[in-house]
Amino acid sequence: MSKSYIGAVLRGIIGLAVAAALTLPVRAETLADALAAAYVNSGLIQQNRALLRAADEDVVIAASKLRPILQWSSSVKRSLSSGRIGSNGVYQSSDSTSTVASAGLVAELLIYDFGASKLAVQVKKEAVLGTRQKLLSVEQKVLIRAVEAFTNVRRDTEKVALRRSNLSLITEELRAAKDRFDVGEVTRTDVALAEARLAGSRSALAAAEGTLRVAVEEYRAAIGHAPKALNGSDKVSKPVKNLDAAKAIAVRQHPDIKELQHSVTVAELTLQQAQLAKKPIVKLSGSYGLTETLTSRAYGRSGEIKLQATGSIYQGGQIPAFVRQSAARRDAARYGLNLAALAVEQNVATAYARLQVATAEKEASELQIRAARVAFLGVREEAALGARTTLDVLNAEQELLDAENNKVSALADQQIASYKLRSSMGRMTADLLGLDVPKYDPEEYFSLQENAPAVSEQGKKLDRLLKSLGKK
C-alpha cells in the first residue's frame, strides 16, 4: 500500500475532526428535546383535547335535565277591522282597531324519573373518562412517532457519513491501484475493479442521502421543526425486568384497555337506561302570563301550577327492542375488552422480542466490526507486501463497511424497540417520561364546566388557542 494512500486517509481523519470541532458551539438537540417539541407542536393532540372538551360539555347537557327549566315569551298583536252594518236601507260604517300585548313565564322541573336522568349523567361522565384515555393513546402515538423520526435521522446521518468515508477510501484505493499499475505491480483488472467499486460507492451514497432527506421531512412533520445537531445516547435501558411483568403492567395501565373498560361501563349504564324507559316521569310545571289591550287599557292575568305524570303503555315493541339492543351492545363491549387485552399482551410480547433481537444484533455487530477491522488492516498490509490483490482489499473494506452499517441499524432498532415496548405497556406519555412540557390537566376544564353551564374563561382561552392553530 502506498504512502500517499495512508497520508490521504490521515488527512481525511484530521479533516473530519476539524469539522466536528467547528460544530461544537451549536447546541445539540437531545431526544428529550425532540419529544417535548413533538408534544407541544402536535395538532393531533390539540384536536383530541378539543374532542375531550366536547365530551365534557355532554356532561353539562345531560345534567341540565336535572335542573329547572325557565322560559319566557312575549308578543304584540295589532288587529284592524272595518265593515258596514245597518237595516232597512240605513247603513253605517264600523271601523275598529286594537293592540294586544302579552308576556309570560314558564317553569318546569323534573321531580322523579326513577334515576334515568342521573344515569344519563353517569353515562356521559364515563364517556369523558374514556375520551381522556383516548387522548393518552394519541399522545403515545405522537411520542413514538417522534422517537422513530429522531432515531431514523441519526441513523441515516451516520450511514451517510459512513458512505462518504467509504467513497473517500475507495477513491484513494483507486489512485493507489493506478499508481501500482503504472509501475507494473498490478494489472488493468485491479484498476477496473477499483473503478467499479467506486461507482457502486457513489450510487450507495446517493441512495443514503436520499433516505436521509426523507427522514428529515418525516422529522419535520413529527417534531414540528427541521432537525438540528442531534445528540442521542447509544445506551438503551430495558424498561421492564421480564415479559410477564411487562404484560401485567400493560393490562393494568394501557390507555386502550382503560378506554374500553369505560366503554363497557357506558354500555351497562345504557342498558339500565333502556330498562327504565317504561317507568313514568313526574314533572312540576308552572306558568304566569299577562295580557293587556293597549287601546282600551283592559288587561288580564293568568297562572297555573301543574304536577304531571306521564308514562308509556305501548309503543309497538320499541322499548323491548331498545333493551335487547342495549344488552347486545353491552356484550359486544365486553368481548371487545377481552380482545383488546389479548391484543395488548401480544403487542407487548412482540415489542419485547424485537428489543431482545435488536440487542443481540447490536452485540453481534460490535464483534463483527472488531473482527472485520482486524481483517481489513491485515489484508491492507499484506496487499502492500504484494501478498494480497486489490480485490481482497476492496472486499475486506466492504465487509468492514457492512459491519459498521449493521451496528448503526442495530442501535437504531434497539432504541426504537425500547420505546415501543414502553408504548405497548402504556407508559409512553409526557408525564411518565418526565418531559419538560406544560402540564395538561383535563380535570380542570371538566370541573369548571360541570358547575358552570356558561362558557368559562378556560374555555375561551382554549377556543382562542384552537383558532390560532387553525390560522397556522
Report the location of each language-model feature.
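Transmembrane beta-strands of outer-membrane beta-barrel pores
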Residues: V76-S82, I111, Y288-E292, G311-I313, ...
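Periplasmic alpha-helical coiled-coil/stalk elements that build and connect Gram-negative outer-membrane
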Residues: M1-Y5, K141-R252, S263, A274, ...
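Flexible, solvent-exposed loop segments that connect beta-strands
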Residues: S81-S96
